[in-house]
Amino acid sequence: MKLTSDVVKKISSIKGEPKWMLDFRLKSLEAFNKSSNPNFGPKLDIDYDSINYYKEREEKLTDNWNNISCGVRNLFDDLGVISAEKNYLDGIGAQYDSEVIYHNMNKELKEKNIIFLDTDTALREHPELFKKYFNTLVKYNENKFTALNGAVWSGGTFIYIPPNTHLDRPLQSYFRINSKNMGQFERTIIIVDEDSELHYMEGCTAPT
């Protein structure tokens, strides 16, 4: 799939994003087209036109594993995600290709005003907080890869921990790529306020 402004606009339209986010995506696309592959790390020969940049969700976002199709649910079960949530975690998000399909946290955390959401929901429900911290630590124009992520990002996790708040157990996000030539471009945004503490984990897999 050739990465064009039409692809970027389609992603933003499907997600129902505000204009400032579409503008950010298009600005990132321009930076991507103008930059070369970074010279750090190994030499990478990437065919950008062979990447599938976005796949529309087949599963609706839910906080109940029983609402997810058996095949996908069994996959996450085999990966240990479901049992980890039951036994070790205060909350978990699970992404399948381009979109988060499962997200949940213990009700005790909600009572502490902790925010733990997928990025689309966070942008919709907490727009000012999201915009304040989005693109502040890693800038879209740092290199070609950050620009690419800025243009086509989808999914990921948004966490806000209020002041003087400590979590007893970790939060986790799990990212699964399951489609051929699929690119996964999630964003992780974590804000831990003054005198607070969080243990956060990520996991990711793809077919061998």
Q: What role is predicted for each listed range?
A:
Residues 1-208:
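Glycine-rich and polybasic anion-binding loops at the starts of cofactor/ligand-binding domains
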